[in-house]
Design a protein with these regions (language model features):
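Active-site bordering "gate/hinge" segments
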Residues: 1-190
Length: 191
């Protein structure tokens, strides 16, 4: 597995995370502040908002033919609050201000009850769900489908050229692009 580590300055990575995880869904710093303030209505020691988008793509070639391809996008928001030794956590696959505030209220209620719990909130359709969600520097997007198939064919040709006894070649390529943004009361901590 090859990991691509971005060497871009943190500010640029933050801007990319905001462009992928906040802006398409109409979320702003004010939205994050409202959610954190909602959690803070109960006495808590710590709270954070965790946004994540993961894109996966895979291709496989067998006997000179592309046999399968896969593509998936998983995204959502999680809200966590810590009160004493208890942790409350709520999450949703929907990234929207309504889902964020629902999760914040749920976490506040759990924390106020003195329990440690995890709650998955229901999915709501999102206006941005049909939009293009990938940052221009997404490494998966650096090659189009034709180029990915050509890469697999090149691997097959190279393998067969090494030894005439090679009668079957199976090749695959898979990639995953993950973007995370964590917001805390004192400001964003990680991208």
């Amino acid at each position: 597995m090859v990991r691509m580590i971005s060497r871009e300055p943190t500010i640029e990575r933050l801007a990319q995370a905001e462009a992928l995880l906040l802006q398409p869904f109409g979320l702003t710093d004010a939205s994050l502040t409202r959610a954190l303030a909602t959690i803070g209505e109960h006495r808590i020691d710590d709270a954070d908002l965790y946004f994540q988008s993961t894109r996966h793509e895979g291709w496989s070639l067998e006997e000179g033919i592309v046999k399968s391809g896969s593509f998936s996008i998983d995204q959502g928001v999680g809200v966590r609050a810590v009160a004493g030794e208890k942790t409350a956590f709520a999450y949703s696959d929907d990234i929207s201000e309504a889902a964020l505030l629902d999760a914040a209220r749920t976490v506040r209620t759990i924390a106020a009850s003195g329990q440690s719990r995890r709650v998955k909130l229901g999915m709501r359709p999102s206006v941005a769900a049909s939009r293009v969600l990938y940052a221009p520097t997404d490494p998966i997007a650096t090659l189009d489908s034709t180029q990915k198939v050509a890469l697999l064919e090149k691997v097959e040709k190279l393998a067969r050229s090494r030894d005439p006894r090679i009668v079957q070649v199976m090749a695959g390529v898979a990639a995953e692009y993950d973007v995370v943004l964590v917001a805390r009361e004192i400001g964003r901590a990680h991208v």
